[in-house]
């Protein structure tokens, strides 16, 4: 009995210790871009060199549930306190992992708007410890970026937003069921119904099978926990959402996102929706518009902390 109590106490203390360490920065290493990388990006983003001149970039390692997890950080070089954005990547494992090219183009762009931007590779990826679960315990790797930001001098942690793309949209929805600290969130081409996803793309079944614990024993249950359309009412109501969707997206069917819009509307969740005609998964054809609406939304509800208007029927 004494041994059992001692063991239980040891486990409890280990958990408490791990939780206390969440977000601790293990490494923050400056990222230097090769001239060839900048030149390549300048073909699509002419101001790439200006981003490098105005924004600091870092590769990071931080603690999440006792695991060393890798990611990236970007922030304006100019002194000051800035609102923050947690960026949630898409893909799985090394597919669509964050890389120097993407970080300069996307995280650098958002940082240049006047934000501290941090993104996780999720556990088990890019040299990180553990194993990702495609919407399981790896959601904590996002949540633990909140205490991570408290260690960044330029970060104003009273103003944190979130921005997720594709699988990162699913991760954003999941994170928003567990925290009310996010002032607003943007979801681009966001996965919201795993059943539609596996029906439209049967190959995704193998991804779930390889990454999701309990998949073979209880497929419907684990897919439902990764399908926000089934628990849209659990998403924090004080976090306004901007959903971006392209009508020609084959990776995440517009059906998923339209269904999610309806569920959010039914639950009177503060919501804005942009549907881009002919837009593919990346919405690259509408890049300028996407940047414009995303920046305006984040500036309004994260930077400026604007209050969402009444959702009840009103007016003349």
Regions found by a protein language model. Name each.
Residues 169-180:
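Short glycine-enriched nucleophile-adjacent loop
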Residues 258-316:
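C-terminal catalytic histidine-bearing segment of alpha/beta-hydrolase fold enzymes
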Residues 242-245, 249:
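Short beta-strand/loop motif that positions the catalytic acidic residue
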Residues 133-153:
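Alpha/beta-hydrolase active-site loop
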